[in-house]
Every structure is written in C-alpha cells, then in structure tokens.
Amino acid sequence: MTLTAHLSYFLVLLLAGQGLSDSLLTKDAGPRPLELKEVFKLFQIRFNRSYWNPAEYTRRLSIFAHNLAQAQRLQQEDLGTAEFGETPFSDLTEEEFGQLYGQERSPERTPNMTKKVESNTWGESVPRTCDWRKAKNIISSVKNQGSCKCCWAMAAADNIQALWRIKHQQFVDVSVQELLDCERCGNGCNGGFVWDAYLTVLNNSGLASEKDYPFQGDRKPHRCLAKKYKKVAWIQDFTMLSNNEQAIAHYLAVHGPITVTINMKLLQHYQKGVIKATPSSCDPRQVDHSVLLVGFGKEKEGMQTGTVLSHSRKRRHSSPYWILKNSWGAHWGEKGYFRLYRGNNTCGVTKYPFTAQVDSPVKKARTSCPP
C-alpha cells in the first residue's frame, strides 16, 4: 500500500473520531487494516528518523498523530488552494519547529531608514505575472539551512546575488557562511535579521564566493575570515520598501527579487498550493522567518481536486499569489518554494520587505522579469 493510501485510510479513522484513540497506539484492539504505527514507520523511512528509546518513540508518535489532525484542520480552514499534510517536520511540536527553523521574533523597530517607494511607481501598471525563476542564471538553487537558524543570511545572500546577476550580467554565488561568521552581533546560527546581513556586507566591503568560503552551518565555531578571500559582489546600500503590495509587486518586476519576513507557522504542514490564511490562523504581526520573494501570479478559476486530507472538491477562485523561495531544501513544498495569497498581507509578508542596492557602473540591457 502506498504512503498516500495509508494516510487516506488513517485519516478516515481520524475523522471518525478513532484517529487518536488508544486502540491505534496499542495492539490491544486486535488487528486492523491500518495502524498509526504503520503510517509513522513509513514517515521514519522516508525522512530517515530514529529515536533513542521507546519513550521518545511513543512521544514522537503522539506528536505525529496530533500534527496530522492539525493538518486536516488547516486543510478545512484554508481559503486558498493550499494542501497540508505530512512533511519532514511532522514529528516536531509547534514550539520545537519554531525554535529549530525560525529566527528571533523581529523587533518593532528597524534600522533608522525611510521606507522607499519610487515616485514613478504610483499609477504605473504592474504585469499580470512575474517569475524570476524563468530568467536564465538569476535565481540560484534552493539551499538547506539544516539545523542552523540562518534563514536571514540565506535570504539576504539570495537577494544580493540575484541583483548582481541582473545588474552586472555576471554569475556569482556569494558566501552565506561569511555572513554567519562576521555578523555584527555574533549570533551565527542562533538567528538574526536581514538588515544585520546587509550591514555585515557593507562593513566588510562585499562578500566572498560560496566556493572560497563554503557553508558549514553549525558544524564549526564561527571565526570571521572576511579579509582572507576576494570579494565577488558588494552593495551600495539597502532599503526597506513600502508595505503596499502593489508597490512591492512593481518594484519586484522592475528591479528583481527582494527579501521578506513572514510568520512561518503554517509552513510546518505545507505541501503545495496557495496559502490564504486568516489573521487568527497566521498572525501577520508575529513574523519569524526570512525568505526570498521571486515573483507573483494568479491562479485560474476552476475546481480544486480532493486531497489526501480532504477528498471533497471545492470551487477554486482566481487567486493572486506571491512566489517565495525557502531555505529548507528542494524536497520541501513546491520544489523548495511556496505560494502565499497576494492582497491581504498573508502571514505578514509585507511587514519587512528589504532589498540591497546593487548598482552597475556600466549601462547594460535590462533583464526583465519573465511572465
């Protein structure tokens, strides 16, 4: 039986009120076509999980069952086309997930700067779609931060190298590790903010290449080696943009990808589709995860097919969305990416839109954002 079939059967039991019963956690009830343990075993195989003692196994099994139930609730509540279910994080509590993969809660005060909206933004039309992934050699491959809480550094590095490739027509892959080792607050893998990354680049007069200064994560003590390697990219400044989504879309289409910081709560259970959350299910004020905004689009109207967690079909309305690049590897979400509804500040996507300023000394043909 496939994993999908296993989950489907288990969730039938779950919805019938039997999913979390003791009979699924023990063998006292006699043989069943499917037990929670069997589903959990497949999860362990798929994501290479093992637990050091029976008590820990039982605890993780209970968390896994709770998370599948939570994913089912999210599936029913979401107003978009998102599908929720089993992910690499399904054996973690919500608190553990936040501690392992989020950053510190972003402060209300940011570096002393003025929000910038170009004067020619207002009144100009925004293209219907924009996807920088389709432009040749602009967006790098999806990285995996692992157990290092460095989403802020990876998002900023992705922003800088994408803009450098657009402005200079030069392929560069900049060092995330340099940002971790040389960050002004010395937090390294313990979290940070994207503006810390930009200030580090300015203080060090640029960044070395990923090849010269490779990512090590939390596998070694952080020792700044910024002066040891040649700089391959640098910035003139960085800017916090307006929180107007129309202005953000225009800036993104004209200039290139930008960093945003969101509430990552729903990403623990996310598989694919457009997340259209409510403020109660994803508080836009509590942002804790930085990612790269690479494009936007609009889903066509139609019928959404049933999912593993919900076999019922529902009307799919035309939904505008953002395309975001994550740092949890290409096997998560939509090949390392995810989509958020565009137009209502879903999960706080407009709270901290930041971008580097990378200017080219030579006038070259502009690379436009592919539709």
Swiss-Prot record:
Q: What is its EC number?
A: 3.4.22.-
Q: What is its main location?
A: endoplasmic reticulum
Which branch of life, at top level? Eukaryota
Query: What is the active site of this protein?
Result: 151, 289, 326
Write the record's keywords in alphabetical order, separated by commas. Answer: Disulfide bond, Endoplasmic reticulum, Glycoprotein, Hydrolase, Protease, Signal, Thiol protease, Zymogen
| Signal peptide positions on this chain | 1-21
InterPro entries cross-referenced by the UniProt entry? Papain-like_cys_pep_sf, Pept_asp_AS, Pept_his_AS, Peptidase_C1A, Peptidase_C1A_C, Peptidase_C1A_papain-like, Prot_inhib_I29
Propeptide segment residues: 22-125
GO cellular component term, pick one: endoplasmic reticulum
Q: Name one GO biological process term.
A: proteolysis
MF (Gene Ontology): cysteine-type peptidase activity
Spell out the subcellular localization from the entry: Endoplasmic reticulum
The protein's role, per its UniProt record: May have a specific function in the mechanism or regulation of T-cell cytolytic activity.
Q: What is this protein called?
A: Cathepsin W
Give me the gene this protein comes from: Ctsw
